[in-house]
Amino acid sequence: MAFLKTLNPLLRRSPTPIPNPRSLLSLDAFLAASSPTAASHATAPAPFAAAAHHHVPIRSGGPLFLSSPPWMLSQSATPLTAAAAALRARLRRARALAGGGAQAVADAVGWEPRRISRDESEVAEAVTGGRERFLNLPNLVSIGRMASGPVIGWMIVNEWYLPAFGTLALSGASDWLDGFLARKMGINSVFGSYLDPLADKVLIGCVAIAMVEKDLLHPGLVGLVVVRDLLLVGGAVYKRASSLGWKWNSWSDFVNLDAIHREKVKPLFISKVNTVFQLMLVAAALLQPEFGTEETQNYITVLSWLVASTTIASTVGYGIKYRQIRPRR
């Protein structure tokens, strides 16, 4: 207590006044302490001495106008409104990415998904699903029947008549099997409607040409069948090109019948009858070298005339159908 009484008079007689602790936190004190000439001009009056009684606390990291005098503010300082808006935008993005879902993310970034029309969605679905439609089980059966044609022809040329007959019987049964599977599986493939008759034509053509080589069928009859099949295949290609307006980006677009301009091929009834007679004729002619007689040869002759007549009738029928559906210019 005596020490404090002794110290108090000494402090009052001191020539250097002790600054007020609150003034040390004022704006003028901060500027004086941070100025390089603060030591030499400590007693000089401040230019804005009139405002020295306003003591503003220093807030580190706050806005610029609280930490600098007006003449030192930069024009590039970020306004509070812009900073607050940017902060709110960042918070929205953070909440969206943290678990707000796809719609919240879209709202945060200002993205609006484009509405896809029904036609565009159907085309996209057909294009992306083209491989699945092409590689279904009924189409694979048709492809197998088509591939068996050259194999059976090779067997006939090498006089393997019985193996050729057995393979032909299986291939003929597959003509019924692919349609049965398509109905049971609910598959309605436009490509399959083209592939099924094409497989029949390749099979019959390869077998018939090989049988002409071995004098098992008349060349005129085989020529009639082959020409008719070529005309039908050419007509199918022409029909597909016409449906596309003779414009397509690539051959994949042309052969992808399940994508755009879907139009199935519907064979005539007379054409189905012709296919049955052709298979019967080829099977009977294959058995003729091993088990044939003069009587069976007569049956083969009758079947040959039936095949010729139904071939001509189906060709005429397709010609009439083409003229009916052909657009008039």
From Swiss-Prot:
The alphabetical list of record keywords is: Chloroplast, Lipid biosynthesis, Lipid metabolism, Membrane, Phospholipid biosynthesis, Phospholipid metabolism, Plastid, Transferase, Transit peptide, Transmembrane, Transmembrane helix
Family under the similarity heading: Belongs to the CDP-alcohol phosphatidyltransferase class-I family.
Kindly list the cofactors needed.
Mn(2+)
Q: Which organism is it from?
A: Oryza sativa subsp. japonica
> In the UniProt record, which is one GO cellular component term?
chloroplast membrane
Residues passing through the membrane, by range: 150-170, 190-210, 217-237, 300-320
Looking at the keywords, is Flavoprotein present?
A: no
> Domain of life of the organism in this record?
Eukaryota
The protein in question is named CDP-diacylglycerol--glycerol-3-phosphate 3-phosphatidyltransferase 1, chloroplastic
The record's subcellular location field reads: Plastid, Chloroplast membrane
Q: What is its main location?
A: plastid
Q: Where is the transit peptide?
A: 1-38
Query: EC number(s) of the enzyme?
Result: 2.7.8.5
The pathway it acts in is: Phospholipid metabolism; phosphatidylglycerol biosynthesis; phosphatidylglycerol from CDP-diacylglycerol: step 1/2
According to its record, how does it sit in the membrane? Multi-pass membrane protein
Biological process GO annotation list? cardiolipin biosynthetic process
The reaction(s) annotated as catalysed by this protein in its Swiss-Prot or TrEMBL entry are:
a CDP-1,2-diacyl-sn-glycerol + sn-glycerol 3-phosphate = a 1,2-diacyl-sn-glycero-3-phospho-(1'-sn-glycero-3'-phosphate) + CMP + H(+)
The entry's function note states: Catalyzes the committed step to the synthesis of the acidic phospholipids. Transfers specifically a phosphatidyl group from CDP-diacylglycerol to glycerol-3-phosphate to form phosphatidylglycerophosphate.
Gene Ontology MF, one: cardiolipin synthase activity
Return the InterPro entries for the record: CDP-alcohol_PTase-I, CDP-OH_P_trans, CDP-OH_PTrfase_TM_dom, CDP_ALCOHOL_P_TRANSF_CS
Pfam families referenced in this protein's UniProt entry, alphabetically? CDP-OH_P_transf
